[in-house]
Swiss-Prot record:
Organism annotation: Chromobacterium violaceum (strain ATCC 12472 / DSM 30191 / JCM 1249 / CCUG 213 / NBRC 12614 / NCIMB 9131 / NCTC 9757 / MK)
Pfam families hit by this protein: Hfq
Subunit structure as annotated in this protein's UniProt entry: Homohexamer.
Disulfide cross-links: none
Entry protein name: RNA-binding protein Hfq
Keyword RNA-binding tagged: yes
GO biological process, one term: regulation of DNA-templated transcription
Classification via PROSITE patterns: SM (PS52002)
Length: 86
């Protein structure tokens, strides 16, 4: 997975995890899963409902939070400027 993909996925999933936001996860085969993001890594998301399911990211089509979330993100140029200022 590209680092740009991780720059988007990780903050998004982390906010969902930290704030215990209920989510609907749609798989590429059309199945809808619901629960809360318990944990995640490069390849999987642990989704907790009555049980914890390990869902492979390559099988996920869409992640839909039950409420709006603010995702803090920086552009690479901003990161470089901050590093140079330090």
């Amino acid at each position: 997975m590209s680092s740009k993909g991780q720059m988007l996925q990780d903050p998004f999933l982390n906010i969902l995890r930290k704030e215990h936001v209920p989510v609907s996860i749609y798989l590429v085969n059309g199945i809808k899963l619901q629960g809360q993001v318990e944990s995640f890594d490069q390849y999987v998301v642990l989704l907790k409902n009555t049980v914890t399911q390990m869902v492979y990211k390559h099988a996920i089509s869409t992640v839909v939070p039950a409420r709006p979330v603010n995702i803090p993100h920086e552009h690479p140029a901003q990161k470089q400027e901050q590093a140079q200022d330090a």
